[in-house]
From Swiss-Prot:
Biased composition (Polar residues): 10-37
EC number: 3.4.14.5
Record's protein name: Probable dipeptidyl-aminopeptidase B
Entry keyword annotation includes Repeat: no
Enzymatic reactions: Release of an N-terminal dipeptide, Xaa-Yaa-|-Zaa-, from a polypeptide, preferentially when Yaa is Pro, provided Zaa is neither Pro nor hydroxyproline
Entry-linked SUPFAM superfamilies: alpha/beta-Hydrolases, DPP6 N-terminal domain-like
Positions of the UniProt region annotated as Disordered: 1-83, 121-143
Organism expressing this protein natively: Penicillium rubens (strain ATCC 28089 / DSM 1075 / NRRL 1951 / Wisconsin 54-1255)
Membrane topology: Single-pass type II membrane protein
Amino acid sequence: MGKFEDDGNSESVPLTRQRSESLASQTSTDSGLSIASESFMKNHKGGNTMPTDGGDGDRYLDVEDGGETGLDEPLISSGTKTGSSSRLRKIVWLLVLLCVGGWVLSFVLFLTQKRPDTAALSSASTVEIHEPGPATGGTSHGKPVTLEQVLSGTWSPKSHAISWIAGPDGEDGLLVEQGEKQDAFLRVKDIRSSEDGVDNLETRVLMKKGYIWFDGEAMLSAKTWPSPDMNRVLVMTDIQSNWRHSYFGKYWILDVATQKAEPLDPGNLSGRVQLAAWSPTSDAVVFVRENNLYLRKLTSLEVTPITKDGDENLFYGVPDWVYEEEVFSGNTGTWWSDDGKFVAFLRTNETAVPEYPIQYFRSRPSGKQPPPGLENYPEVRQIKYPKPGSPNPIVNLQFYDVEKNEVFSFEMPEDFVDDERIIIEVVWASEGKVLIRETNRESDVVKIFVMDTKARTGKLVRSDDIAALDGGWVEPTQSTRVIPADPKNGRPHDGYVDTVIYEGYDHLAYFTPFDNPEPVMLTKGNWEVVNAPSAVDLKKGLVYFVATKEAPTQRHVYSVKLDGSDLRPLTDTSAPGFFDVSFSHGAGYGLLSYKGPAVPWQAVINTQGDEIDFINLIEENVELAKMVEESAIPTEVYSNVTIDGYTLQVLERRPPNFNPEKKYPVLFFLYGGPGSQTVDRKFTIDFQTYVASNLGYIVVTVDGRGTGFIGREARCLVRGNIGHYEAIDQIETAKIWASKSYVDESRMAVWGWSYGGYMTLKVLEQDAGETFQYGMAVAPVTDWRFYDSIYTERYMHTPEHNPSGYANASIDDVMALGHSVRFLIMHGVADDNVHLQNTLVLIDKLDLKNIDNYDMQVFPDSDHSIQFHMAHALVYERLSSWLINAFNGEWHRTANPKPQEST
């Protein structure tokens, strides 16, 4: 189900695992620049001075849970997301006190009393809320958050897309910006200060306009990739989406000096290219067209075919659907060696993979018109989609010798057999060596190979049996960093930094030489690194990474030396925070992104000293901060509950003007996929915010067992039986909330999208109407035998090895679903990820048992995100109106309809 890509709308993210998609060290050749980034706004001098959060401290509260606050959040009033003026707040409260002083005094006395809410189950921890003063309702002033604002992106923080690039002579501190400035659409800036003792390079404009001219026609740029020497730019136009991460387009080579463009392949102007990448030496481009790999040397207008037999079943250099979605979360399967002499690429044979038909009733994504007489038939796209137990694509790694114009491959000792192998990472090292990471089909054995392309030999350097270690699995990651030998700096051998399992948590380890089975552990403790490492400064011998060291819900940036000493934070850990970072080519500079809990900001930092220095604050989101001041934002209460000995993170969103003497309906929002995370400290204004702010309902989210960043024991417990423990944790937490004095236990609902849709149905099935009366499931899996093999078998094994687990995990007890008051199911008809088959099979089960307490809506031609014909807005409008009807009791009236007498 791909990596968990948090785009600020997590409920619509397809079935994924959480990886907190770091901006880790993007270079200009990693991905095309497609988002505008304006020039720097402010210059900050003064050492390690963070931009201030500002604002009142009552939007969210930390909650003590049975004396276990040390497990996550400190028992303090944490930072804020509001950014409003504290002086103005004092004036407002003074006026309130003058007007209703006696009432406020009695209210404060009431609130300062400890009022424990007894848990419904003895296995769950008692929660005591400690509220700092009378501001229990949070920001009650202002206008409620509207659904239109959420859907239009009005509440989305602004962020800037910049990519780092090494200078022609390896200079650090150069970044590529793309924007709309006059005659400076794409430019390279040198952010190094004269204080660093370097001569700054002049800002260089690579592309003056956001379009190119060729043969009298202007074509708008969709993506751009500067060459490493910055003399040319690879430009893509006419982009056409394929799957979630892949696309087609026309590619051009723009000469920076003349600003003239030529086709990537002058002999084929109409060809749709799937992928193109510069050589590190800037003298060639490798590209994929119609699943074949080609090379264009800039000294010639001719292209050289590297492969010739690519077709609809045989892919070269690009992943097929399942590898794109579940392994790489991207569109590339091609990797240049650092010296530009070799190209490594995947050969994917999916001949044996069964097809699944995707039907389109209102559109024709192929762009082709049907033959006469067939206009009234839907277009059908057959995709190769391996389901659990069915044949997977057979993937091998091949190499191309640029000088010899030769394709070759060679056997690796102790390799997996073809139908067991999943290649999850390819990393070039020095002198023609390359690291290959593979897993078996069920993703519980990982092997690391080192291949020597010059000697054409391979060696197994590491093998980890994850199933034997903790019964879990390994996630496909692409963050390994090669550390080249440097005897002068104490590194006699090549090595690499990798994430490994250490004492039940994900930590960083340094392996040197490659085949050393005993690594240097760089991090240790009851916390985890995230998509690490982020970067390595080879000059200083420092490894930078993001981790949950302060709390599972937080992210801070740290550094540690290659010998494992001197681990220190780069960000302020004295208050809750959620940071991300991307580093420059040499890791001397970085783009630091603060994502919450206050209004997000971005700054360029200098990491060359003992402490970080802020160079430029490039985004403060001033307008967003003003919106927060003027809006009625829910109070967020962070706490944790303990279920069966596991401490789980909980977020409660309380409506503005929250009154503890009232009875509120409660909506549980969940995702719950293996390794995912929904409760975090990011600034988020989403559908859940709208529900609390505008509809006045309480919204609760709990990350149950199986989710990420609370240790592998809690995560791996769900293997082979997904849905079971996760549903228990939602139900147990819901019973705790149902017992609270301010909750109406007769009005409780649960909702989710994708894996969250599956979990919604699983919760309703296991609960059987005891706790939850309502549920809303969007694009749900209902039987894991219907989902793709690589994702499902990672957590469930194959159906052959675990038939009872698949049976237990399916939504099968429809009689239990019938005990809820009502539930809603929505699905896109053209969903290539979670097929409509899931919903249709469940509907048939309901029909067979005459269960009719549900509503269903499908969206023609919409995929997993449900976007076709503006359907995304329709989904949320339906969720909102359906929930209002539920909590208003309308579905009780429809349960046993009676005819009215005629008048």
